[in-house]
Regions:
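Alpha-helical transmembrane segments and membrane-interface helix-loop junctions
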Residues: 1-182
C-alpha cells in the first residue's frame, strides 16, 4: 500500500498570505543555518584557544549551547515548510479521501493548539527573564532574555507555518498529508 507524496515543499499557489509565510519560514531557515555555522566557528575558536594557546575560555561554551538551541527553535517553520518532520502515512493511506481530509484537519488543529500553548508559555517565560533582567550565573553573565527570545519567536513562526498549512489544505492548494488521491 504505497502512496505518491507530492509534499516535498509546502505549496503556496498565488495566495499572498501563504507566500508571505513561506518567505518568513525560508528566512528563519537561513537564520537557523547561520546560527549553526556560528556555533561551529565558535567551537573551533574555543578548541584553538584551549588546546593550542592553552588559554581559558569564558563565553564560548554557553554561546554554542544557546546558538544550537536557538537554531533548533528558529528552524522549526522551515523544516515544516519542507515537510522534513517525521511523517507516518500508513493510516492516511488506508483512509478514503473524506476521512483523510478529516484526519488532516484534526492533526493540524491539534498541532496548532499544542504549539499555541507552547508559544504562550514560552512568551511568559521570556517576558519574565526580560522583566527581571535575569543573567546567567556564569562569568560571561549573558542577559538571558536574549537567547530565550528564540523560544517565542521559533514557536510563533512555527505556529504561523502550521496555520498556513491548514489554510493551504482548506483552500485546496495542498492535499491532506501531501498524498495524491489514492
Amino acid at each position: 500500500m504505497a502512496g505518491q507524496s507530492s509534499a516535498a515543499i509546502a505549496r503556496t499557489g498565488n495566495n499572498p498570505f501563504l507566500r508571505f509565510v513561506a518567505a518568513l519560514s525560508t528566512l528563519a531557515g537561513w537564520c537557523s543555518a547561520a546560527m549553526i555555522v556560528a556555533a561551529v566557528a565558535i567551537t573551533c575558536q574555543m578548541i584553538f584557544i584551549r588546546f593550542v594557546l592553552n588559554g581559558s575560555t569564558i563565553w564560548q561554551t554557553e554561546a554554542v549551547i544557546y546558538l544550537a538551541i536557538g537554531a533548533t527553535l528558529i528552524g522549526l517553520p522551515y523544516v515544516q515548510r519542507l515537510r522534513g518532520h517525521v511523517n507516518v502515512d500508513l493510516v492516511p493511506l488506508a483512509l478514503n479521501k473524506r476521512l483523510r481530509f478529516a484526519l488532516a484537519v484534526f492533526t493540524l488543529s491539534l498541532s496548532i493548539i499544542m504549539v499555541s500553548i507552547m508559544l504562550w508559555c514560552s512568551y511568559e517565560f521570556w517576558h519574565l527573564t526580560w522583566e527581571r533582567n535575569w543573567r546567567s550565573d556564569t562569568v560571561w553573565g549573558v542577559r538571558l532574555w536574549i537567547p530565550y527570545l528564540a523560544l517565542p519567536v521559533g514557536f510563533g513562526l512555527f505556529l504561523l507555518q502550521l496555520i498556513a498549512d491548514m489554510v493551504a489544505m482548506l483552500l485546496g492548494i495542498e492535499k491532506p498529508f501531501g498524498l495524491e488521491d489514492v
